[in-house]
Structures are given as structure tokens and as C-alpha cells.
A protein has these predicted regions:
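Positively charged, small/polar-rich N-terminal and surface patches that mediate targeting and assembly
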Residues: 2-119
Length: 119
């Protein structure tokens, strides 16, 4: 592992689906050039809800969310986290969570660049 690896972080945000474009725009504005977004389901304090289908009531225990992953140099983490908070926050239960983890290694497949150069 290269010394540059300790300077890489993964910012993972789980947000409401309708906030995706707003969050993407906020990340672009702070210099993020790429991200991964996945449709996921989950629950927390928001819990689920009930829906009626063909006259029967069903408990929906998992709610649709979007998981965003952004790999950044560690000196950019605060700006990325602030951008996600500012753009994803509605003030309601279920706004989501942000997690920051360390990346041990990164490789750009096309060029073979590694670690911070691969971001």
C-alpha cells in the first residue's frame, strides 16, 4: 500500500430519492468529478408505512433510498460532507445518513494509476 492511500476517503450518503439531482449538482459545484449512485432500501427512525393494494393493507417496512459513494482525497471530505448536508436536508425524519471511511487502495483500470492519482 502506497503512502498516498491514507489520504483517500469514501463518503457514503444514503438520501431520499428525490434529492439525487440536487445532491449531484452540489457535489459538482465543490469539484467532485464522479460518483456512484445506487437504488437501495432501508429503514431507521422513519420506519416504514402501510399501503392499500386491492383492498388489503400491506406494511412496507423498507423505504426506497439512494446510496451515493464518492471517493475523494481526505482534504476534500469536509466540503463534500457539507455539500451533501446542504443539498439533501429537508428537516424531516428520513433525510438520511453520511458515513466516511478510509480507502486502502484505488486503481484506475484504464491507466493503471493508483491511490489518489486514480481518484
Amino acid at each position: 500500500m502506497d503512502n498516498g492511500a491514507k489520504f483517500m476517503k469514501m463518503v457514503i450518503a444514503v438520501i431520499k430519492p428525490f434529492k439525487l439531482e440536487e445532491v449531484r449538482d452540489a457535489l459538482v459545484a465543490v469539484g467532485v468529478h464522479g460518483m456512484t449512485a445506487s437504488e437501495v432500501k432501508g429503514y431507521g427512525r422513519q420506519k416504514g408505512h402501510t399501503e392499500i393494494y386491492r383492498g388489503a393493507e400491506y406494511a412496507i417496512n423498507f423505504l426506497p433510498k439512494i446510496r451515493i459513494e464518492v471517493a475523494v482525497p481526505s482534504d476534500r471530505v469536509d466540503k463534500v460532507v457539507e455539500a451533501v448536508i446542504a443539498s439533501a436536508k429537508t428537516g424531516q425524519i428520513g433525510d438520511g445518513k453520511i458515513f466516511v471511511t478510509t480507502i486502502d487502495q484505488a486503481v484506475r483500470i484504464r491507466t493503471g494509476e493508483t491511490d489518489v492519482d486514480a481518484l
